[in-house]
Design a protein with these regions (language model features):
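Gram-negative (and chloroplast) outer-membrane scaffold detector with strong preference
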Residues: 49-112, 119, 123, 134-140, ...
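Residues that define the transmembrane beta-barrel architecture of outer-membrane proteins
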Residues: 25-27, 40-44, 72-76, 122-126, ...
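A cross-taxa feature marking solvent-exposed loop/turn segments within ectodomains of secreted
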Residues: 22, 39, 87-89, 137, ...
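Sequence/structural signature of outer-membrane beta-barrel proteins
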Residues: 32-38, 63-69, 100-105, 145-153
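Cleavable N-terminal export/targeting peptides
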Residues: 1-24, 167
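Membrane-embedded beta-strand positions of outer-membrane beta-barrel proteins
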Residues: 27-33, 58-62, 78, 94-96, ...
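A generic hydrophobic-segment detector
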Residues: 122-167
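Short glycine/proline- and aromatic-enriched beta-strand/turn motifs that initiate or cap beta-hairpins
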Residues: 20-65, 164-166
Length: 167
């Protein structure tokens, strides 16, 4: 009986390692599209995912939001993800990172109060959020992110959906 229990525990411990993929040092590249509430516009961009360890991922990205009502924006994010596998093909990850955005306004934009106010505003900030990743096939994945960007005068909620490949 004792040997049976030890064998079962050993078998379970060995099979657990198969649930955690070995990603350390791998790089993924993909595209993303989404919506941001403050700019009230759709955006598209690219992202890179670099696994520093099996669970810690560095994710820089660039996104451009199309012009709407005389306003447009582009942004660069440098996020960190802590990937938590929930099944063999699905993972959740909290998001934390830094943000830089460039906001452009036409002269007739509602945000321009007087003629002397600059029409371009640069905003550093912080990102916090949650993401979900689903591995579609070998080296192919889809991801969905919901994050809040803390910016001076322009804080916003942003939803992004992406698609990417691992190398």
């Amino acid at each position: 009986m004792k040997k049976s229990v030890i064998l079962i525990v050993l078998f379970l411990l060995l099979s657990l390692s198969k649930l955690v993929a070995q990603f350390e040092g791998t790089i993924g590249v993909g595209t993303q599209a989404g919506y941001a509430t403050e700019i009230n516009s759709l955006g598209a961009g690219i992202h890179i995912h670099y696994y520093r360890t099996n669970n810690l991922r560095i994710a820089p990205s660039f996104t451009y939001f199309i012009e709407r009502k005389g306003e447009n924006m582009w942004m660069i994010d440098a996020d960190a993800h802590y990937v938590i596998p929930v099944s063999i093909t699905a993972s959740l990850y909290p998001i934390a990172g830094i943000h830089y955005s460039n906001w452009n306004f036409d002269a007739d934009s509602e945000r321009i109060v007087n003629e002397l106010e600059p029409r371009v505003k640069h905003r550093p900030g912080v990102n916090l959020g949650l993401g979900f990743q689903h591995d579609i096939g070998y080296r192919v994945r889809a991801n969905f992110e919901l994050k809040y960007q803390f910016l001076k005068d322009y804080s916003q909620v942003m939803f992004m959906a992406g698609f990417g490949f691992w190398f």
